Design a protein with these regions (language model features):
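Alpha-helical tetratricopeptide repeat
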Residues: 1-163
């Protein structure tokens, strides 16, 4: 029996038990088992090569201005490689094009969480703050990016637009 089937069987048994007796300990075990099942599913999804394929497909859609399709591809790439700053950055750029700034900001912050020296993360985060009208945060973010790459033309231009 596969691990997936064992998780499913355990979850079914916990749910059946809860129908008969609403025991808080059983509820806790059910939640823990569901969490373990989800983590196991996520682990099985990891495949950096497939992530690259999805990133390439996402870039192709981006260049064709098919932004919703690009988001789908980048999202699938993130599932396959959740530590790729490039894929988060690309999805952030796509969300910016869609004017979904809270989502874009979240992805930019994830880039910087994964790699605080990833300069494009500062660019994307600053752009999001700019469009969310949090100008002081945008300027601060651009300054952090410029400390890492003082000659970065994109960040300099974005900072000038914010000032």
């Amino acid at each position: 029996m596969s691990a997936q089937n064992k998780f499913d069987e355990a979850i079914d048994l916990y749910k059946t038990s809860l129908l008969e007796n609403n025991d808080p300990n059983v509820k806790d075990q059910l939640k823990k088992t569901e969490k373990l099942k989800k983590e196991d599913e996520e682990r099985k999804m990891i495949d950096p090569e497939k992530a690259e394929e999805h990133m390439k497909a996402g870039k192709d859609y981006f260049q064709k201005f098919e932004f919703p399709n690009a988001v789908k591809e980048f999202t699938e790439g993130i599932k396959r490689n959740p530590t790729s700053t490039a894929i988060y950055s690309n999805r952030s750029a796509t969300y910016i094009k869609l004017m979904e700034f809270p989502h874009a900001l979240k992805d930019a912050e994830k880039c910087l969480q994964l790699d605080p020296t990833f300069v494009k993360g500062y660019l994307r985060k600053g752009i999001c703050h700019h469009f969310l009208k949090v100008y002081h945060k945008a300027l601060d973010t651009f300054d952090k990016g410029l400390k890492l790459d003082p000659d970065n033309k994109e960040i300099k231009e974005a900072k000038l637009k914010t000032m």
